[in-house]
């Protein structure tokens, strides 16, 4: 993923409330050490943006070893940024960033409104005309 390009696209929206769907480096894992989304989140926080992060596989209580040490160093206040549901991310965000190909994300972004922007970093399978939000991709 082009982290800088994703960062630039998000900043260019001028929006302040950013939702991240998917935080681990790939769907179905809780490993954050190889995740470019962690780096992106750090950059967005550095710009003072408000983040709401959802990844059903990432739970601070379950993180152990090197994975736990890594995230505590990179984003020590992660617990305050985690949302418990996808709907919470959709409801609270002006920009919704899709960071991995978890199957439920393709359906979830259909709930986004015309006022919201969806930035898809992974090229989800789409439902085309059903999507109401401003849909943007990266590198495809």
Where are these regions (language model features)?
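Structural/interface elements that position substrates and couple domains in central-metabolism enzymes
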Residues: 1-140
